[in-house]
Swiss-Prot record:
Keyword Cytoplasm annotated: yes
A single GO cellular-component term on record: cytoplasm
Pathway: Glycan biosynthesis; glycogen biosynthesis
Source organism of this protein record: Rhizophagus irregularis (strain DAOM 181602 / DAOM 197198 / MUCL 43194) (Arbuscular mycorrhizal fungus)
UniProt gene name: GLC3
EC number: 2.4.1.18
Recorded catalytic activity of this chain's protein: Transfers a segment of a (1->4)-alpha-D-glucan chain to a primary hydroxy group in a similar glucan chain
InterPro entries noted in UniProt: A-amylase/branching_C, Branching_enzy, Glyco_hydro_13_cat_dom, Glyco_hydro_13_N, Glyco_hydro_b, Glycoside_hydrolase_SF, Ig-like_fold, Ig_E-set
Major site of localization recorded for this protein: cytoplasm
Classification via CDD domains: AmyAc_bac_euk_BE (cd11321), E_set_GBE_euk_N (cd02854)
Name of this protein: 1,4-alpha-glucan-branching enzyme
Length: 683
């Protein structure tokens, strides 16, 4: 039965209400969303021929070269009363290539080829020049432009470039099989170099991909790819939505990066920013046709007070075409395997999450504060992507806890595959910042790690790029602080602070990995406890690149202790590949002992034991388990190669006893030293 047929039934109850009966009082609001979604799908089918044609807007709009070398340029600019294409090819003469406007506000010009060669040369500058109803002449970068560059000797504003290389990129590798357990390596191309400068696509391909593969991750999430004028915005102030950042290299060099990753078996996800747009006028979408409301809501509704940016009007036909086509473009042109949607909370609520604390009450998700246009756009985006690309992965960044965010659209959900577990890193930072180790509450830790919605998959992480930014601290820095500058060498004594830091860094990440979700994420460098924070060049730091880089040299130096954390992270990822606990059912926690600071649980045919006690080790400690038989150590955080003390004899096997313990049918007895975690495999 199709969603349309189901919704038409008077007594139809959305599937989400069967999954979570507490949602039944809100069924009318859920059905209203589905009605709105159904209406959009029907109109797209009737007027555009369905998702497939509608989402190929980049083949109709912007500059497109025909097989005979002719160029057709189309632009939606309903407020303009005149328009022309200008550029180096016609000496910026507004009279040479005037455009014609149709009844939908779309401007068009046909530029014949010369002897089969496009009139506009490859890699030359262009603009659209328009006249407003008030008679003002305005020049803009084409909204669908695929490449923009910056010449700081001339202007801070970016230039639109007609990009039509004579040799197209030849793809070598097919996309890999969709991973059943998702282990994401979050990365930023520009900071991925030791040196104090902007890194390149080619450097990332040649130097970083092999690190990611060796560590055992199976997916990469690339940040700051969509073109953004301000480097320090971390890519979140997008100016050209169809352009990829030229500061890292050419489009073909990004294609090579993705192609090479695919050859290594790595999925590549794009951090897509559809939650807002840069307010730049000269090189952005703001005031594109001279009006305040071309792509955005008008007035205050179209502005994000905290981000100082513009907000899309998701309910407009051409805006919807633009955004859905943007997603399709990156799938087709660059062969990305999916998206991490940024700022989903802002898209789903009129208040954008500003000054709002979510209590978890369901009225917060279905009342007047919800922006139905934004929610329905996300439903359409996920529906389109999953219908056209069944192997795609979509991830949402939402702090509100919206029910159904990761349930199918036809069930009344919003259609994402995963949501980020944003409460987990907040918990770890709060513990390290505010509590002594003796005061850590094992029950609260386990509750936060397992507090996720039924049948909605979650990506767990102990820290991401958010915690690395200036003004915050990474886990390693919270744990070891200034001693990272003086005592991370194996040639110096192992101080109590460094010893504690290494131990807890491993345990925090392992517990998060094992208990926190159905996927895992790490921000580049954090796997080895990257020193210092992340700060992009800006006026406030004298435009310094010192903190806008990754110090790979410290993990490559055998004399430094960073290598221990790196080796542990590698072992952890490869163990997950072997046992697949992320794709296993949620763990059964048999032990949360506050006084002893012990946690034990079963997941993925593995028995996990954590001793967070600062000083107390336990001999012959009874650990309950459902499985009878022999156990052996699969992972031990206390190994010397991980910076531990080798206090455990790993040649020993553990045999279960058939007596109930901690609610399990059997138990084993283990030696578990302080600040050590063990993962035991069941033979």
């Amino acid at each position: 039965m199709s969603p349309t047929e189901m919704i038409s039934q008077e007594n139809y109850e959305p599937g989400i209400c069967k999954i979570d009966p507490w949602l039944k009082p809100f069924a009318p609001a859920i059905k209203r969303r589905l009605e709105s979604y159904k209406k959009w799908v029907k109109e797209i089918n009737q007027n555009e021929g369905g998702y497939d044609k509608f989402s190929r807007g980049y083949e109709r709009f912007g500059l497109n070269v025909l097989p005979n070398g002719d160029i057709i340029y189309r632009e939606w600019a309903p407020n303009a009363v005149a328009a022309s294409l200008i550029g180096e090819f016609n000496d910026w003469d507004r009279s040479k290539h005037p455009m014609k406007k149709d009844s939908f506000g779309v401007w068009e010009v046909h530029i014949p080829a010369k002897n089969g060669i496009p009139t506009i040369p490859h890699n030359t500058k262009i603009k659209i020049s328009m006249t407003t109803p008030e008679g003002e002449c305005i020049d803009r970068l084409p909204a669908w432009i695929k490449r923009v560059t910056q010449d700081l000797n001339v202007s801070l504003a970016y230039d639109a470039i007609f990009w039509n290389p004579p040799q197209k990129y030849q793809w070598k590798n097919n996309s890999p099989k969709k991973p059943t357990s998702l282990r994401i390596y979050e990365a930023h191309v520009g900071i991925s170099t030791n040196e104090g400068r902007v890194g390149t696509y080619n450097e990332f391909t040649d130097n970083v991909l092999k690190r990611i593969k060796d560590l055992g991750y199976n997916a990469i999430q690339l940040m700051a790819i969509m073109e953004h004028a301000y480097y320090a915005s971390f890519g979140y102030q997008v100016t050209s939505f169809f352009g990829v950042s030229s500061r890292y290299g050419t489009p073909e060099e990004l294609m090579r990066l993705i192609d090479t990753a695919h050859g290594m078996g790595l999925y590549v996800l794009l951090d897509v920013v559809h939650s807002h747009a840069c307010k730049n006028v000269l090189d952005g979408l703001n005031m594109f046709d001279g009006s305040d409301h071309c792509y955005f809501h008008e007035g205050g509704k179209g502005r994000h007070d905290l981000w100082d940016s513009r907000l899309f009007n998701y309910g407009h036909w051409e805006v919807l075409r633009f955004l859905l086509s943007n997603l399709r473009f990156f799938m087709e042109e660059y062969r990305f395997d999916g998206f991490r949607f940024d700022g989903v909370t802002s898209m789903m609520y009129h208040h954008h999450g500003i000054g709002t604390g979510f209590s978890g009450g369901y009225h917060e998700y279905f009342g007047d504060t919800v922006d139905e246009g934004g929610v329905v756009y996300l439903m359409l985006a996920n529906d389109m992507l999953h219908k056209l690309y069944p192997r795609i992965i979509t991830v949402s960044e939402d702090v509100s806890g919206m029910p159904g965010l990761c349930l199918p659209v036809e069930e009344g959900g919003i259609g994402f595959d995963y949501r980020l577990a944003m409460a987990i890193p907040d918990m770890w930072i709060k513990l390290l910042k505010e509590q002594r180790d003796d005061d850590w509450d094992m029950g609260n830790i386990c509750w936060t790690l397992t507090n996720r919605r039924h049948m909605e998959k979650t990506i767990a992480y102990a820290e991401s790029h958010d915690q690395a930014l200036v003004g915050d601290k990474t886990l390693a820095f919270w744990l070891m602080d200034k001693e990272m500058y003086t005592h991370m060498s194996d040639m110096t004594p192992l101080t109590p602070i460094i010893d504690r830091g290494l131990a807890l860094h491993k345990m925090i990440r392992l517990l998060t990995h094992g208990l926190g979700g159905e996927g895992y994420l790490n921000f580049e460098g954090n796997e080895f406890g990257h020193p210092e924070w992340l700060d992009f060049p800006r006026a406030g730091n004298n435009n310094s690149f010192h903190y806008a880089r990754r110090q790979w040299n410290v993990v490559d130096d055998d004399l430094l202790r960073y290598k221990y954390l790196n080796e542990f992270d590698k072992a952890m990822q490869h163990l997950e590949e072997q046992y697949g606990w992320l794709s296993s059912p949620q763990a059964y926690i048999s032990l949360k002992h506050n006084e002893n600071k012990l946690v034990a649980f079963e997941r993925g045919n593995l028995l996990w034991i954590f001793n967070f006690h600062p000083t107390q080790s336990f001999a012959d400690y009874k650990i309950g388990t459902e499985w009878a038989g022999k156990y052996s150590i699969a992972l031990n955080t206390d190994r010397k190669i991980f910076g531990g003390h080798d206090r455990i004899d790993e040649s020993i096997s553990y045999h279960s006893q058939p007596h109930e313990w901690d609610g399990r049918k059997n138990y084993i007895q283990v030696y578990i030293p302080c600040r050590v975690a063990l993962v035991l495999s069941h033979c």
